[in-house]
């Protein structure tokens, strides 16, 4: 892009709304946005990264609906944006963050009326029409964001940014109608994706507190061993965000990244942010064996809701030997009727067997159960209560109830 004036870019992870009655609050580094920052910087752009949570982890502000806003206030966040910034991207995360993100975008638009405003994440992807109609965004990025963000930035830099020609975005046309372009194809070789640009954000603030997605086991870095999930649970945003293609990384290249974090950030533990890290038994066995071959020493966790099918006694022994200490299972319900309606594709009995095998081999197992699915009967709720007791007897040390 020699000859073009490269625009300055700012990526923002907004503050987070937390109910006032929450007894525990632990925040995680923004992995998705860090990947986008890495891709943009690798393409030659000058990227500023504002992590409104990480820059002020111990600060909270009163918010609506008996909640607190943790991190920088919207005005503090906007004040940190460089005055000559031309492209500003906001990570929207999930729908509970929508009001906060929308208000932040409005504040940015007031201060930077001519900037190109981008938004991406689960909420934008799931409800693009609402996002574009109710916010000041110019472009919403759908699904995997690295390639789309780079294409937008390059088009802007060249002066030839044509919204209609960019796959994987949504925007308003000249009549105020929402346009949703054809989705961008998933990247098949995810080992080509540039590592997250953690050096652009205050990662040390998380590390020194042991903050992460899983149990506090010291200085924890987030990593992703795969993208996507082959399952189609009806309540999950995965099919819209990532599609149902599960793509794993090369274990050696993943371990290269983890070794880099050990050397440069003093990482002691790794939290895997995968939607479904263990799909193929052969992959996880290979990964565990590679850790042993390299004689790497660390703990690692699978905190996001692991499938149980591939975890038997053999795999559980390898997991523990390689340093894995905590896993989360997400059976969601103990009722066959509910499981069928939500397309969970698991059997409660297999979950119990997997918990038993894992705990016998030293693993700490947490389980997630959801009450309140549409059409759920009292009988089905009772079945889930019985299932909770069975999981506890099988060895689960923590069971989270969601409603």
Regions found by a protein language model. Give the residues of each.
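Short, Lys/Arg-enriched N-terminal segments with co-localized hydrophobic residues
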Residues: 1-5
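Catalytic cores of alpha/beta
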Residues: 128-133, 315, 375-390
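Radical SAM [4Fe-4S] cluster-binding motif and immediate context
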Residues: 191, 196-366, 371-373
């Amino acid at each position: 892009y020699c000859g073009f004036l490269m625009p300055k870019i700012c990526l923002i992870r907004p503050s987070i709304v937390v109910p006032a009655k929450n007894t525990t609050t632990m925040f995680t580094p923004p992995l998705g946005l860090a990947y986008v920052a890495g891709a943009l910087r690798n393409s030659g752009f000058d990227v500023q990264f504002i992590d409104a949570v990480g820059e002020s982890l111990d600060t909270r502000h009163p918010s609506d609906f008996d909640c607190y806003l943790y991190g920088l206030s919207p005005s503090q966040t906007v004040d940190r944006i460089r005055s000559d910034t031309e492209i500003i991207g906001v990570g929207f995360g999930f729908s509970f963050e929508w009001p906060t993100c929308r208000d932040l975008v409005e504040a940015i638009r007031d201060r930077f009326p001519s900037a190109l405003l981008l938004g991406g994440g689960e909420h934008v992807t799931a409800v693009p029409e609402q996002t574009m109609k109710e916010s000041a965004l110019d472009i919403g990025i759908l699904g995997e964001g690295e390639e789309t963000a780079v294409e937008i930035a390059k088009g802007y830099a060249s002066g030839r940014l044509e919204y209609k020609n960019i796959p994987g975005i949504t925007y308003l046309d000249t009549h105020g109608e929402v346009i949703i372009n054809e989705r961008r194809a998933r990247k098949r070789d995810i080992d080509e994706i540039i590592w997250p640009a953690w050096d652009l954000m205050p990662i040390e603030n998380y590390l020194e507190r042991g903050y992460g997605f899983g149990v506090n086991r010291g200085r924890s870095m987030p990593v992703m061993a795969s993208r996507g999930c082959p399952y189609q649970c009806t309540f999950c945003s995965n099919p819209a965000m990532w599609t149902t293609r599960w793509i794993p990384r090369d274990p050696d290249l993943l371990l290269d990244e983890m070794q880099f974090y050990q050397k440069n950030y003093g990482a002691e533990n790794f939290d895997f942010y995968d939607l479904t890290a263990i799909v193929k038994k052969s992959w996880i066995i290979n990964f565990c064996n590679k850790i042993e071959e390299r004689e790497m020493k660390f703990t690692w966790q699978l905190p996001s809701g692991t499938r149980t099918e591939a975890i038997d006694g053999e795999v559980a022994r390898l997991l523990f030997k390689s340093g894995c200490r905590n896993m989360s299972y997400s059976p969601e319900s103990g009722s066959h009727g509910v499981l069928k309606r939500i397309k969970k594709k698991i059997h409660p009995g297999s979950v119990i067997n997997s918990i038993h095998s894992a705990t016998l081999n030293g693993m700490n197992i947490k389980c997630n159960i959801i009450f309140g699915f549409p059409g759920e009967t009292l009988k089905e709720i009772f079945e889930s209560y019985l299932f909770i007791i069975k999981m506890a007897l099988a060895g689960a040390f923590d069971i989270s109830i969601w409603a």
